[in-house]
Amino acid sequence: MQWLADYWWIILILLVGVLLNAIKELRRLDVKKFLDNKPELPPHRDLNSKWDDEDDWPQKKP
C-alpha cells in the first residue's frame, strides 16, 4: 500500500478525468430525440401475464 500513498494524486487525476468525460457524454445525450425514436419493448418470453388467468381470490358473499 506504499504505492498508494506515493501515487494518490495520479489516481485522483484519473478519477477526475473519468468524471469529466462522463459529464461531457451525458450533456451530448438528447433525451427528447431518444424518447421519440425509442424502440417498442418486446413482450416477455415467459408470458407471466398469461399463466394465471383464473381468479384465486375467494369470492365475497353478499
Swiss-Prot record:
Residues annotated as transmembrane: 3-23
Residue ranges of the region described as Disordered: 36-62
GO cellular component: plasma membrane
Domain of life of the organism encoding this protein: Bacteria
Primary residence: membrane
Protein localization: Cell membrane
Pfam families, A to Z: UPF0370 (PF13980)
Keywords from the UniProt entry: Cell membrane, Membrane, Transmembrane, Transmembrane helix
Topology in membrane: Single-pass membrane protein
Family statement drawn from the similarity comment of this UniProt entry: Belongs to the UPF0370 family.
Protein's UniProt name: UPF0370 protein plu2724
